[in-house]
C-alpha cells in the first residue's frame, strides 16, 4: 500500500471546510459530564472553547471563566481539549483570547479586526474579537501560522502560545514587506519597531516559519 497524507483541514480554501458553532455541547468522560458554553468546530474537530460569564453578576468574572476552562475542564474532560487550540473568556465587556494552557495573566484582548482599525472598546470588543480572530478565514490563519508549541525537551511540554493581535498584524506586514523586497530586489524591507515586552521574539518565530514555507 502506498502511504498518503490526509489533510483534516483545508487551510487554503476556507469554503471547503465545515464550520460549526455549538452551544452547550455535552462532553462525557468517565463519570464526568460537562457542558462548555460554546465550542467552535472545523470539520468535526473542536478548535476553540468559549466560556461566558454574566456581566450583571458581580461574583462572575472572566477569571472564573478561565478557571472553568483551564482547571475544571482540563481536569474533568481533557479529551475534549486535546485538539482545542484556542480559548476565549468573556463577560461581554471584557474579552480575551489565549489557549487552554495560557495562564490568566497572559490572556489578551483582540482589539482590532484589521490593522488600520482603531482599537475597540467596551461591548464592541466582543464583536471585534469574533470578527478579528474567530471568523472562518481568520481562525484558519491563526491556527496555521500563529500557534506555537515550544520544544518539549527544552521547555514545559504543557506550554502552548497563540499570537496577540499586534504580533499577528506585525508578522503579516513584515512578511509582505520582505516578499516585496525580494521580488523587487531592493534589499529593503522587514524593518520592525516594537516596544519592550511586546513579544518580538514570538513575532519573529511566527514570521520565520511563514517565510520558510513560502
Regions found by a protein language model. Name each.
Residues 1-214:
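ATP-dependent helicase/translocase motor core
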